[in-house]
From Swiss-Prot:
Binding site for Mg(2+): D69
Function: Pyrophosphatase that catalyzes the hydrolysis of nucleoside triphosphates to their monophosphate derivatives, with a high preference for the non-canonical purine nucleotides XTP (xanthosine triphosphate), dITP (deoxyinosine triphosphate) and ITP. Seems to function as a house-cleaning enzyme that removes non-canonical purine nucleotides from the nucleotide pool, thus preventing their incorporation into DNA/RNA and avoiding chromosomal lesions.
Quaternary structure (record): Homodimer.
Catalysed reaction equations from the record: XTP + H2O = XMP + diphosphate + H(+); dITP + H2O = dIMP + diphosphate + H(+); ITP + H2O = IMP + diphosphate + H(+)
Keywords of this entry: Hydrolase, Magnesium, Metal-binding, Nucleotide metabolism, Nucleotide-binding
EC top class named in words: hydrolase
The name this protein goes by in its record: dITP/XTP pyrophosphatase
Cofactor dependency: Mg(2+)
Organism of provenance: Vibrio parahaemolyticus serotype O3:K6 (strain RIMD 2210633)
Protein residues bound to substrate: T8, G9, N10, Q11, G12, K13, S70, F154, G155, Y156, D157, K177, H182, R183
EC number(s) stated in the UniProt entry for this protein: 3.6.1.66
Active site: D69 (proton acceptor)
Length: 200
C-alpha cells in the first residue's frame, strides 16, 4: 500500500479522506503523525491554498502529499463563506459557531434563493518541487436549510440540503455521502488522472 500524507489538521477531513483513499490502495497518514506545523493559508483561491498545504507537507515529510481546500459557496452571499468556510465566525471558530453565523446571515431568505454548493479542490504533489501537481475539482449542489438536521458528517453538513436524497448531508450514511460529495467527486477525478498517467 502506498503511503501518502494528508495535509490537514481537520480530523473530520482526515477520517473522510482516509476512508475514500483506502479504496484506491493508499495508506493515509495525517500530517500530525509527523508533527508537521500548520501553514498559513495565504492564497486567495481554493487552488492556491491547496498547493501551499500540499507543498508544505511534502517538504516536511519527504512523502507525496495530498491537500484539499474546500468550502461552502452560498449564492445569496455572493460565494461566501468560500475559502473562509472553516473560519467564517473567526480564526478559532468551531463548526457550530460557523454554522450559526451562516444561519443568521441567511435568516428570512426564501428557499429559492438559498442555493449553495460545496466546492473541493484536491492537489497531489509527488514531492515538494513537483512542477506538475495534479489538481482536481469536485462540486456538490444543494441549498441551505433553515435549521440543523442529522448527526453525521462535520462542518456545514447539518444545514446543507441534498436534493438527490431529500435530506441534510449530516443525515446521509457515510457510504452514500462518499458517492455524492464534492470530496468524493474530486478524488474520483484524481484517481482517473493517476490511472491515465500510469497507463502511459
Amino acid at each position: 500500500m502506498k503511503k501518502i500524507v494528508l495535509a490537514t489538521g481537520n480530523q473530520g477531513k482526515v477520517r473522510e479522506m482516509a476512508d475514500l483513499l483506502s479504496d484506491f490502495g493508499f495508506e493515509v497518514l495525517a500530517q500530525s503523525e509527523f508533527n508537521v506545523s500548520e501553514v498559513a493559508e495565504t492564497g486567495t483561491t481554493f487552488i492556491e491554498n491547496a498547493i501551499i498545504k500540499a507543498r508544505h507537507a511534502a517538504q516536511e515529510t519527504g512523502l507525496p502529499a495530498i491537500a484539499d481546500d474546500s468550502g461552502l459557496e452560498v449564492d445569496f452571499l455572493k460565494g461566501a463563506p468560500g475559502i473562509y468556510s472553516a473560519r467564517y465566525a473567526g480564526e478559532k471558530a468551531s463548526d457550530q459557531e460557523n454554522l450559526e453565523k451562516l444561519l443568521a446571515a441567511m435568516e428570512g431568505v426564501p428557499e429559492a434563493e438559498r442555493t449553495a454548493r460545496f466546492h473541493c479542490v484536491l492537489v497531489l504533489m509527488r514531492h515538494e518541487n513537483d512542477p506538475t501537481p495534479i489538481v482536481c475539482h469536485g462540486k456538490w449542489e444543494g441549498r441551505i436549510l433553515t435549521e440543523a438536521h442529522g448527526e453525521n458528517g462535520f462542518g456545514y453538513d447539518p444545514i446543507f440540503f441534498v436534493p438527490e436524497d431529500n435530506c441534510a448531508s449530516a443525515e446521509l450514511e457515510p457510504a452514500r455521502k462518499k458517492q455524492l460529495s464534492h470530496r468524493g467527486k474530486a478524488l474520483k477525478s484524481l484517481f482517473a488522472q493517476l490511472s491515465a498517467q500510469t497507463a502511459q
